[in-house]
């Protein structure tokens, strides 16, 4: 970055500080990961300069022959990776992929169903503060209070009562496998479309370690980062019968020109996900997450639903008298990066000061952490949580975290 260092020292310094932060902290945010050097190079390529409104072979600008080539690569690889009939790789984010899917599948004012945000859903699945809650009539479904898993029987009851035009599934904080076959059956009973948001579990689905929604869903949306380890962006998969509607909803309805440098990086990430090593990585992520869950239980912490089937765990801190906000700050000071999170059915919590925290292993596993390092990390988490606000404990843990981190290079930066 010699040019940037000279031309804009302020931005250069911020990037260097972020690089140091990445190297010297343990990232347990379930929605974060490290991209490869190849993905970073593609995202910083000359495709940044190219406007390419439209689709391959149907652009509104000249000079798009190589943009066409790279987008076709991304499309073909996405279709192959997920066994889909059609793919659109232009959405700038997962939220915009979701927006396009809504615009293609339902009309403003239609009834939709989505998982309650406080039960693990996402803002774009019907939250009142989101466009979905403002444009559509939203019926929320939730978890069973005893099992803390999706209450499919009540979901079906609500669907029969309200007859939604579309049911949305997928989550941002749900640690269990989703039963796509059951969702499809419920949709068929009420003649509803099924939209599945796999942003969190896309890598697991691609690796064959989580059931794929593609055979059951009318439309599937996702991010290209998180467990997929690509650039920050979105994409959509759908049946061929919806291809035209989806493409039109992305462009010209929702977006203008695609970010071709990001599309190129998506193509690279999809190719990386087709390699045998990617499956090995996802298996290690699941193994590490199981180890994490077991170690958290040993500390006496309560896990929502009792455990996990995927890459994340949701921890209810209410029994130990700590809230998620204070836990997030204390752990950050100790070099462990997590996020606060609401807990289903918890009382006296808000989005800013929730009752729990969400932990995930995708980034730590990409860095090379195995069960031993996860056990060590959970031990530090326990020490910090049991000594909330103790600066001496936080400083001691931070020093140990930095010492461990120096043994594990950060993908895309060190290797």
Curated annotation (Swiss-Prot):
EC number: 2.1.2.1
Gene Ontology CC: cytosol
Top-tier EC class: transferase
One GO molecular-function entry: pyridoxal phosphate binding
Superkingdom classification of source: Bacteria
Matches recorded under Pfam families: SHMT (PF00464)
Keywords, alphabetical: Amino-acid biosynthesis, Cytoplasm, One-carbon metabolism, Pyridoxal phosphate, Transferase
Cofactor: pyridoxal 5'-phosphate
Gene Ontology annotations of biological process type: glycine biosynthetic process from serine; tetrahydrofolate interconversion
Pathway entry: One-carbon metabolism; tetrahydrofolate interconversion; Amino-acid biosynthesis; glycine biosynthesis; glycine from L-serine: step 1/1
Protein's cellular compartments: Cytoplasm
Catalysed reactions, as listed in the record: (6R)-5,10-methylene-5,6,7,8-tetrahydrofolate + glycine + H2O = (6S)-5,6,7,8-tetrahydrofolate + L-serine
Residues annotated as binding (6S)-5,6,7,8-tetrahydrofolate: 117, 121-123
Site, Plays an important role in substrate specificity: residue positions: 225
PTM annotation (N6-(pyridoxal phosphate)lysine): residues: 226
SUPFAM superfamilies given in the database record: PLP-dependent transferases (SSF53383)
NCBIfam families: PRK00011.1
Family: Belongs to the SHMT family.
Protein task: Catalyzes the reversible interconversion of serine and glycine with tetrahydrofolate (THF) serving as the one-carbon carrier. This reaction serves as the major source of one-carbon groups required for the biosynthesis of purines, thymidylate, methionine, and other important biomolecules. Also exhibits THF-independent aldolase activity toward beta-hydroxyamino acids, producing glycine and aldehydes, via a retro-aldol mechanism.
Subunit structure: Homodimer.
Protein name: Serine hydroxymethyltransferase
Native species: Dehalococcoides mccartyi (strain CBDB1)
């Amino acid at each position: 970055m010699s040019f940037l260092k000279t031309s804009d020292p302020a931005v250069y310094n911020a990037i260097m500080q972020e690089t140091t932060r990445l190297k010297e902290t343990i990232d347990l945010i379930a929605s974060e990961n490290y991209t490869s050097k190849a993905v970073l190079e593609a995202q910083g390529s000359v495709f940044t300069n190219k406007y390419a409104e439209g689709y391959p072979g149907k652009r509104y600008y000249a000079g798009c022959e190589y943009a066409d080539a790279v987008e076709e690569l991304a499309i073909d690889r996405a279709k192959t990776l997920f066994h889909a009939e059609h793919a659109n790789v232009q959405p700038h984010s997962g939220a915009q992929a979701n927006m396009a899917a809504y615009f293609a599948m339902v009309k403003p004012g239609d009834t939709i169903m989505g998982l309650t945000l406080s039960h693990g859903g996402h803002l774009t699945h019907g939250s009142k503060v989101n466009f979905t809650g403002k444009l559509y009539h939203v019926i929320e479904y939730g978890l069973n209070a005893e099992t803390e898993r999706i209450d499919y029987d009540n979901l079906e009851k609500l669907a029969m009562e309200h007859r939604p035009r579309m049911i949305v599934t997928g989550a941002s904080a749900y640690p269990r496998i989703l039963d796509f076959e059951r969702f499809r059956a419920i949709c068929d009973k009420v003649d509803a479309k099924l939209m599945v948001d796999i942003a969190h579990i896309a890598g697991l689905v691609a690796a064959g370690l989580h059931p794929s929604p593609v055979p059951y869903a009318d439309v599937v949306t996702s991010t290209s980062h998180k467990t997929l380890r690509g650039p920050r962006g979105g994409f959509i998969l759908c049946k061929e019968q919806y291809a035209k509607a989806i493409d039109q909803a992305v462009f010209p309805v929702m977006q203008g020109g695609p970010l071709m440098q990001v599309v190129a990086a998506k193509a690279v990430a999809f190719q990386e996900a087709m390699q045998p090593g990617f499956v090995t990585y996802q298996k290690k992520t699941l193994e590490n997450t199981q180890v994490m869950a077991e170690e958290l239980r040993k500390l006496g912490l309560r896990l929502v639903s009792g455990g996990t089937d995927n890459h994340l765990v949701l921890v209810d801190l209410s029994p130990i008298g700590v809230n998620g906000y204070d836990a997030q700050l204390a752990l950050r000071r100790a070099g462990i990066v997590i996020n606060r999170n609401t807990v289903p059915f918890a009382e006296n919590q808000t989005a800013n000061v929730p009752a729990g925290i969400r932990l995930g292993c995708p980034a730590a596993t990409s860095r090379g952490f195995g069960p031993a390092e996860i056990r060590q990390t959970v031990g530090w988490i326990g020490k910090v949580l049991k000594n909330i606000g103790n600066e001496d404990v936080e400083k001691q843990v931070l020093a140990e975290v930095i010492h461990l981190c120096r043994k594990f290079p950060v993908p895309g930066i060190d290797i």
